[in-house]
Structure formats: structure tokens, C-alpha cells
UniProtKB/Swiss-Prot annotation:
Protein name: Leucine-rich repeat-containing protein 57
Alphabetized SUPFAM superfamilies for the sequence: L domain-like
Pfam families (UniProt xref): LRR_4 (PF12799), LRR_8 (PF13855)
One GO location term (cellular component): membrane
Repeat among keywords: yes
Cross-referenced PANTHER family: LEUCINE-RICH REPEAT-CONTAINING PROTEIN 57, PTHR48051
Length: 239
């Protein structure tokens, strides 16, 4: 795209605090945005071909609340991204990310994290440091097991659909705020589903279709009645 078009977008963003440039075939993060590090609240560069974020610029957007780079070619995230102390929404669906920076737990304001369609091989332990995290989407990755650290996750909703999960720590029942757990289309045997999820957790929507067991058998598990009480109570609340 031409420089004049980009300049026009930058000028608009200066007034609105929102920079949106989708579907433009961009191969790199626009360096012109460094003029706006103290204005921008929202950046959306989805549906481009960006393969990296510039470490020297990305951490300087001190007011940024929402960053979207869905459908790009990112393979790694720089540590400097984690300087964004006001960031509430981070959407990086359909990239090529295998892991998150070790400093990711410093994104202390983060509420919504979308990483669907990446190449994560494990549940990132850094997520357990994020105290305000509400919604986490890790669907369509390559996660094989959910470790004990999951018990410290603060999220209300966790989407793990379409992974390769065959092991699930019993500690998932200890998540203090977890209400919605999506595990559809994984590799779980019925014996690998901790009974405490049903009988002794906060979870009121558990989606497990498309695993290695029949739903009929799932409904026969001890504790299923208790789970259904929570499910029905929640349904009534929102009816």
C-alpha cells in the first residue's frame, strides 16, 4: 500500500487512538506507529503477513488496551511485548507460535487471550500468573497434557477444543473461577477425566464431545448429577 494511505491511517489514529489496517498484505509492523506510542489504545493488524514484532517499538505503547494480529505469520513474541501493563485483550489466532515469552506473566491487566490455531505444545505456565485473566482460547493447538500448575489458573473460561490432550490433571478442579471448560475433539479416555471436575469444582459447562468415549457413558459417571445441578442453575440464571 502507498505511503500516503498509510499516513492517512496514522493521522486518523492520532485523533481516535485506534489503528486498524487489515487485509493489506503487510509483511512488517508499520514503523510509522512509533510516533503514536503514547496515543494508541487499539491496534488491529489482522489478516496480513507480518512475521515478527519489533522489540524496540512494541513495548512502548503504554496505553494500549487491545492488540490483534490474527492470521499473520508470527513465530515468536518479543519479551518487550510484556511491558504493556494496560493490555486487556491480546488476539493472535492463526499464527505459528510454539511458546510464549517467559515474561508473559507480567501482562498484569490481561483479561482475554486468544491463541487458537497456533503450534503450542503445552499449556503455558505463565498464564497462571495472570490474576485478571477471564477468557483463554487455546483451541486448535498441539497440547497433549494439562499439568498440575493449571490449578492456579484464574480464568473463567478455558477453550482447549481440537488439541491432542490425553492427560488432564485432577488440579483442574481447583481452578477458583473456572466455569466453562471446553475439551471437544481431543484424545481423552473416560478414565482420564477427573471425577472431581463433576463432583467438586466450579465448572458449570463442560464440553467433551468428540473424545475416545461415548457421551452416554460420561453421563453415567459418579458426580454427573452434581454437575447437572450447577449446569441447570446457571442456565436458569441466564434464561
Amino acid at each position: 500500500m502507498g505511503n500516503s494511505a498509510l499516513r492517512a491511517h496514522v493521522e486518523t489514529a492520532q485523533k481516535t487512538g485506534v489503528f486498524q489496517l487489515k487485509d493489506r498484505g503487510l509483511t512488517e509492523f508499520p514503523s510509522e506507529l512509533q510516533k503514536l506510542t503514547s496515543n494508541l489504545r487499539t491496534i488491529d493488524l489482522s489478516n496480513n503477513k507480518i512475521d515478527s514484532l519489533p522489540p524496540l517499538i512494541i513495548g512502548k505503547f503504554t496505553l494500549l488496551k487491545s492488540l490483534s494480529l490474527n492470521n499473520n505469520k508470527l513465530t515468536v513474541l518479543p519479551d518487550e511485548l510484556c511491558n504493556l501493563k494496560k493490555l486487556e485483550t491480546l488476539s493472535l489466532n492463526n499464527n505459528h507460535l510454539r511458546e510464549l515469552p517467559s515474561t508473559f506473566g507480567q501482562l498484569s491487566a490481561l483479561k482475554t487471550l486468544s491463541l487458537s490455531g497456533n503450534q503450542l505444545g503445552a499449556l503455558p505456565p505463565q498464564l497462571c500468573c495472570l490474576r485478571h485473566l477471564d477468557v483463554v482460547d487455546l483451541s486448535k493447538n498441539q497440547i497433549r497434557s494439562i499439568p498440575d500448575t493449571v490449578g492456579e489458573l484464574q480464568a473463567i473460561e478455558l477453550n482447549l477444543n481440537q488439541n491432542q490432550i490425553s492427560q488432564l490433571s485432577v488440579k483442574i478442579s481447583c481452578c477458583p473461577r473456572l466455569k466453562v471448560l471446553r475439551l471437544e475433539e481431543n484424545c481423552l479416555e473416560l478414565s482420564m477425566l477427573p471425577q472431581s471436575i463433576l463432583s467438586d469444582s466450579q465448572i458449570c459447562l463442560l464440553a467433551v464431545e468428540g473424545n475416545l468415549f461415548e457421551i452416554k457413558k460420561f453421563r453415567e459417571l459418579e458426580g454427573y448429577d452434581k454437575y447437572m445441578e450447577r449446569f441447570t442453575a446457571t442456565k436458569k440464571k441466564f434464561a
